[in-house]
């Protein structure tokens, strides 16, 4: 079968006709096919099965394989390997440094790394079924004794009868009864019982707050004091977060010409005032105009 070579070109190389023609001059055009990687990636072109003895991945317009690595995914790589003959080679363009495709993908596809960036598709011949002819009698088994003869020469030992009483005695010896009263001595039995948690009489009833006795000894009073201290600390922390310092307060005098609030539109009316504006509810006024309140009526 004649050798056939496949050249895979990225789109950046095909956009430079002069450089592409210079690359094609290094190969025999009568035994070379050219295919675009972007057309394979988009599914616009397909490759024949087991048609090429060698596949060469060309470098892009920048003399690197970065564009080829982006286009050759696992699906496209398996399609390329399917068009390679058994014993064929796939590699990147000569005199170009870099990796044309992923090494792990090549190994997973069943290729063998032969060096210098070349990978070979193993030439595995098709498996053929080979019948096995087994004779009825083998020479090395001809002199072997039969089963009946071996049984006669080596008889089995006589059977031993085991009575039920013997079995019961063995079980009784294995499982001895233990007196539970002997597990604890007098000192352990007389030790006080320590209750964990509040005593039953100190437990609150449903819907009522827990209250400790005046002479509480079960630890409920101490537990309630710790809970109150935690609540008080949380309340003080929240109060400190809401407290404003002197530097946080800003006083704005609206009776002086040119003085405005933070939004700068307080004098235009409620539609232009923020939520915390002190002039909410007052009519619009001129900046610098004196505002007076007389009998809850606004006097401008």
UniProtKB/Swiss-Prot annotation:
Task: State the compartments where it is located.
Answer: Cytoplasm; Mitochondrion intermembrane space
Q: Which GO terms describe its biological process?
A: iron-sulfur cluster assembly
One GO cellular component, as annotated: mitochondrial intermembrane space
- Cofactor annotation: [2Fe-2S] cluster; [4Fe-4S] cluster
Instruction: Name the Pfam families for this protein.
Output: CIAPIN1, DRE2_N
GO MF annotations, alphabetized = 2 iron, 2 sulfur cluster binding; 4 iron, 4 sulfur cluster binding; electron transfer activity; metal ion binding
| Top-rank lineage group of the source organism | Eukaryota
Q: Where is this motif: Cx2C motif 1?
A: 263-266
Motif Cx2C motif 2 mapped to chain: 274-277
Annotated spans, Fe-S binding site A? 202-218
Question: Which keywords appear in this protein's UniProt record, sorted alphabetically?
Answer: 2Fe-2S, 4Fe-4S, Cytoplasm, Iron, Iron-sulfur, Metal-binding, Mitochondrion
Coiled-coil annotation reads none
Ranges for region N-terminal SAM-like domain: 1-130
Q: Which amino acids does the record list as binding [2Fe-2S] cluster?
A: 202, 213, 216, 218
Q: Where is this region: Fe-S binding site B?
A: 263-277
Subunit structure, per the record?
Answer: Monomer. Interacts with tah18. Interacts with mia40.
Name the protein family. Answer: Belongs to the anamorsin family.
Function in brief: Component of the cytosolic iron-sulfur (Fe-S) protein assembly (CIA) machinery required for the maturation of extramitochondrial Fe-S proteins. Part of an electron transfer chain functioning in an early step of cytosolic Fe-S biogenesis, facilitating the de novo assembly of a [4Fe-4S] cluster on the scaffold complex cfd1-nbp35. Electrons are transferred to dre2 from NADPH via the FAD- and FMN-containing protein tah18.
The written remark on domains in the entry is:
The C-terminal domain binds 2 Fe-S clusters but is otherwise mostly in an intrinsically disordered conformation. The N-terminal domain has structural similarity with S-adenosyl-L-methionine-dependent methyltransferases, but does not bind S-adenosyl-L-methionine. It is required for correct assembly of the 2 Fe-S clusters.
Please give the name of this protein.
Fe-S cluster assembly protein dre2
Q: Which organism is it from?
A: Aspergillus fumigatus (strain CBS 144.89 / FGSC A1163 / CEA10) (Neosartorya fumigata)
Q: Which gene encodes it?
A: dre2
